[in-house]
């Protein structure tokens, strides 16, 4: 789905002698009555309200989950793998690495650099918080990861690559990062089209990070400073707004321009180098920062975020120089966030959340909280010191769970946290659907969601609400830094066993199978390879699978043939002999890119027939075990990835289905006194007015004599039951039935010793005489999965004609005004209520007895009554 963000509005090594700041001309705080809302001036908790160290620990983990590129050996996120390995190839560079911005997969350099600067600032302000929480190594890993990317993105002094991936194309696909199918173009700024904002911000990030690495790795710190100097010179010399040059405007437009970054970047270079000329540059550029409309007051009714760093520079320069103009600007800004200025204050919810803007409101509150904590440490004004400190603690505690919902807004932390953030890889869909599966498959520990978008404390944990449930690297930036300062002040303990091990929620790459067409001289199987991988998501492009079978007595190996009427992989040709009477057929899907990225992309279908003439019996075939008339996991068909088994169990020599021994083992048939297991629950298909087909899963026999066959019984309504036939197969065709009549069928297994199993029964009703009849050319099964005003429809078409079709057209009419919104495996057209589906190139032909599956997403209102008037190439179809 497409997600477009609207415009937001939305102790350094070389510090000078410390000056405590006093607001000499500070105005008195506004009264609560003037504002009509409660003041955020209550005393903060003397003891920690939450385990801030745990929250910081999980926030560091979130940044690891956002990594792009080849992951390191110490990767802690079990559901993440290598991704974006071709980034930069379009421009002949290695631009791998860095962070994915949010729940999408674009690497936006502007917010990425801001995030790095804020994280580094937090470590500079409170190294003790990171050390006491045990998170300093993880912080440095994260900062090194992103700065390594900045180094790659800055191949020459006046060139900076600022974006990889196209936001519009990226947002049209919903799937995990490891299998992204779209092109990922690279975009740069240079003298011909400059970006002073992003270049100066990246300079700030590298300069601030160099301070964090200066003691441990001075050589790396020096490299960062060198790049920072070049980038700042580039930003200052060639002035321009980066979003005029790259397609980031719909996502991260530079609304505030580049003036704030010129101040911000110069300040951090001063802190990294001790060169006073950078401080002078910061102070000079400061005077050109924006002001409130029709005043000479610096802007104060917004806050520090990825776009505008002015507010951070108020505090940094006040702290560094002690000059009154910076102090006044910092006070006015933070007063607006606490007690108000000139009768105006940021809106507050009844529960105490400061709500600046709809999108990412908690992010803005957390950023402001961090800078307020920094400022509160260095000012002398006791009223403001307490006010700003307590405001900050209150906002962070609100995010952690101190709110009217008594719920955390940090994934995987605290009480009732969000479980379904708007994040493609954490969701783990394999069908390119934001709605499926219903719950996220992975826990995106530490991610701060956007939270309530209005000052009403209301929130719903809904992945499709991408305003309240968006997560992003910049959301956690000031939040992490504030947590470090609260750990330093209040303490806390990281979890000893974090992160917990995530186990897959089921088979990831597997084979399903069903009986496609029953026969007495052959076995015809429909097999479906599915790739639903998520630990991590991965491509299957060297897949093969094997179907093992036993050659029955009287069947000549030379008579065995294998064929395929419908195959999305390579056509099987040979039968392979293992030993004795054990053989297998191998289906080669090498070259087919099967990945968890869509309805069609995550699966491949193969219909194959193994024919051997009279005497053919699949009941003792290894791979036939458990296969019925509906697609279901087939654990005895073995799937390989480049020769390595990833699904299924292969037979050992001499082993037979059910665990029995091969020839020469077990008891003699006459000694068998154990009845076989009951057949699987019968299913009914191809129902007409006079016939139907029963299918069931094979019975097993542990007594040693083996299953001899099955007896089929039938009764109509309350009439008398009669035996209607016997078979050695797992299917039986019922004929001579009455139209519009309810029948009960029963299947009983018997072994070679005469033991009889329990009965398995099924009830069905034949069609009325006008319901398609025995001569219907096709059968259509139609099923839906409904939600709110939408639904997913699956259609299974079985062709019953005698001559193959080279192409086909399915037609039907919606009875209740439904609309097709997106389809797969066919080209869909709708004219009013009339719908037609025509094939893709790979499923255009239909052999007699073949089946094709198609589907679509749709919308409905009132009722979702299913269509019933299906035709195939103009001929009416029976309903399955």
From Swiss-Prot:
**Do you know which Gene3D superfamilies this protein is assigned to?**
1.50.10.10, 2.60.40.290, Endoglucanase-like, Immunoglobulins
Q: Which Pfam families match?
A: CBM_2, CBM_3, fn3, Glyco_hydro_9
GO annotation, biological process: cellulose catabolic process
Per the database record, which ranges form the CBM2 domain? 771-880
Q: Which pathway does it serve? A: Glycan metabolism; cellulose degradation
Residues in domain Fibronectin type-III? 678-770
Keyword Transcription regulation assigned to the entry: answer is: no
Region span, Disordered: 647-688
Ranges for domain CBM3 come to 504-652
SMART domains named in the record: CBD_II, CBM_3, FN3
The residues the entry assigns to the signal sequence are: 1-46
Q: Which residues act catalytically here? A: 104, 422, 427, 461, 470
In alphabetical order, the GO MF annotations are: cellulase activity; cellulose binding
Q: Which UniProt keywords apply?
A: Carbohydrate metabolism, Cellulose degradation, Glycosidase, Hydrolase, Polysaccharide degradation, Signal
Q: Could you tell me the EC number(s) of this protein?
A: 3.2.1.4
Q: Which reaction does it catalyse?
A: Endohydrolysis of (1->4)-beta-D-glucosidic linkages in cellulose, lichenin and cereal beta-D-glucans
Q: Which family does it belong to?
A: Belongs to the glycosyl hydrolase 9 (cellulase E) family.
PANTHER family assigned = ENDO-1,4-BETA-GLUCANASE
What is this protein's record name? Endoglucanase E-4
Q: What is the lineage of its organism?
A: Bacteria, Bacillati, Actinomycetota, Actinomycetes, Streptosporangiales
This chain is encoded by the gene named celD
């Amino acid at each position: 789905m497409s997600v477009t963000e609207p415009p937001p509005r939305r102790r350094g090594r070389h510090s000078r002698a410390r000056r405590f700041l006093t607001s000499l001309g500070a105005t008195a705080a506004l009264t609560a009555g003037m504002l009509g809302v409660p003041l955020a001036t209550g005393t903060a908790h003397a003891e920690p309200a939450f385990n801030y160290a745990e929250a910081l620990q999980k926030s560091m983990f979130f940044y690891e989950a956002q990594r792009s590129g080849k992951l390191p050996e110490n990767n802690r996120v079990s559901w993440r793998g290598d991704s974006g390995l071709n980034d930069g190839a379009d421009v002949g560079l290695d631009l791998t690495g860095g962070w994915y911005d949010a729940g999408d997969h674009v690497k936006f350099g502007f917010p990425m650099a801001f995030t790095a600067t804020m994280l580094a600032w937090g470590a500079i302000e409170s190294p003790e918080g990171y050390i006491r929480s045990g998170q300093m190594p993880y912080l440095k890993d994260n900062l090194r990861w992103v700065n390594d990317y900045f180094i790659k993105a800055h191949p020459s002094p006046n060139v900076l690559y600022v974006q990889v991936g196209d936001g519009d194309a990226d947002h049209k696909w919903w799937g995990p990062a490891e299998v992204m199918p779209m092109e990922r173009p690279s975009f740069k700024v240079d003298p011909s089209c400059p970006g002073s904002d992003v270049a100066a911000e990246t300079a700030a990030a590298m300069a601030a990070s160099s301070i964090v690495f200066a003691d441990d790795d001075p050589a790396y710190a020096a490299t960062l400073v060198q790049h920072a100097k070049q980038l700042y010179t580039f930003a200052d010399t060639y002035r321009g707004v980066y979003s005029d040059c790259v397609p980031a405007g719909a996502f991260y437009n530079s609304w505030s321009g580049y003036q704030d970054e010129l101040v911000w970047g110069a300040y951090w270079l001063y802190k990294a180098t001790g060169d006073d000329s950078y401080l002078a540059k910061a102070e000079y550029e400061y005077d050109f920062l924006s002001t409130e409309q029709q005043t000479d007051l610096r802007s104060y009714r917004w806050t520090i975020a990825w776009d505008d760093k002015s507010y951070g520079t108020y505090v940094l320069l006040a702290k560094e120089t002690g000059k009154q103009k910076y102090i006044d600007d910092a006070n006015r800004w933070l007063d607006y966030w606490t007690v108000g200025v000139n009768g105006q204050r940021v809106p507050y919810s009844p529960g105490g959340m400061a709500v600046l803007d709809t999108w990412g409101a908690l992010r803005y509150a957390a950023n402001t909280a961090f800078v307020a904590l920094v400022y509160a440490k260095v000012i002398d004004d006791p009223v403001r010191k307490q006010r700003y400190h307590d405001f900050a603690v209150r906002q962070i505690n609100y995010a952690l769970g101190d709110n009217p919902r008594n719920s955390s807004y940090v994934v995987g932390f605290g009480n009732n946290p969000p479980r379904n953030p708007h994040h493609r890889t954490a969701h783990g869909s394999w069908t390119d659907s934001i709605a499926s599966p219903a719950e996220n498959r992975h826990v995106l520990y530490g991610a701060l969601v956007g939270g309530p978008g209005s000052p009403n404390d209301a929130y719903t944990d809904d992945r499709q609400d991408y305003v309240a449930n968006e997560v992003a690297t910049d959301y956690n930036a000031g939040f992490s830094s504030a947590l470090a300062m609260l750990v330093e002040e209040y303490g806390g303990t990281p979890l000893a066993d974090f992160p917990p091990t995530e186990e897959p929620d089921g088979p990831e790459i597997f084979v399903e199978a069903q009986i496609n067409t029953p026969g007495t001289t052959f076995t015809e199987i429909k097999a479906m390879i599915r790739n639903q991988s998520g630990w991590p998501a991965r491509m299957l492009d060297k897949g093969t699978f094997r179907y093992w079978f036993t050659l029955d007595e009287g069947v000549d190996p030379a008579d065995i043939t294998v064929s395929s009427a419908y195959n999305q992989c390579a056509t099987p040709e040979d039968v392979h002999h293992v030993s004795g009477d054990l053989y297998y057929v191998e289906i080669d899907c090498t070259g087919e890119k099967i990945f968890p990225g869509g309805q069609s992309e995550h699966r491949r279908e193969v219909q194959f027939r193994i024919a051997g003439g009279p005497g053919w019996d699949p009941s003792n075939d290894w791979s036939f075990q458990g296969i019925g008339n509906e697609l279901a996991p087939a654990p005895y068909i073995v799937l390989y990835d480049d020769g390595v088994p990833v699904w299924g169990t292969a037979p050992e020599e001499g082993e037979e289905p059910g665990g029995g021994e091969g020839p020469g083992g077990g008891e003699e048939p006459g000694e068998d006194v154990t009845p076989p297991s009951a057949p699987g629950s019968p299913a009914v298909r191809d129902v007409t007015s006079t016939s139907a087909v029963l299918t069931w899963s094979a019975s097993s026999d542990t007594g040693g004599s083996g299953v001899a066959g099955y007896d089929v019984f039938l009764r109509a309504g309350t009439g008398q039951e009669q035996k209607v036939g016997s078979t050695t197969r797992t299917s039986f065709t019922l004929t001579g039935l009455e139209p519009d009549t309810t029948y009960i069928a029963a299947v009983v297994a018997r072994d070679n010793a005469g033991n009889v199993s329990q009965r398995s029964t099924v009830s069905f009703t034949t069609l009325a005489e006008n319901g398609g009849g025995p001569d219907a050319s096709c059968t259509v099964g139609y099923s839906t999965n409904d939600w709110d005003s939408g639904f997913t429809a699956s259609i299974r078409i079985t062709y019953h004609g005698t001559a193959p079709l080279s192409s086909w057209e399915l037609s039907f009419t919606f009875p209740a005004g439904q609309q097709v919104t997106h389809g797969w495996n066919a080209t869909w057209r709708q004219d009013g209520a009339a719908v037609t589906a025509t094939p893709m190139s790979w499923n255009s032909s239909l052999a007699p007895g073949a089946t094709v599956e198609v589907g679509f997403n749709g919308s409905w209102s009132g009722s979702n009554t299913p269509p019933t008037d299906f035709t195939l190439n103009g001929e009416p179809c029976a309903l399955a």
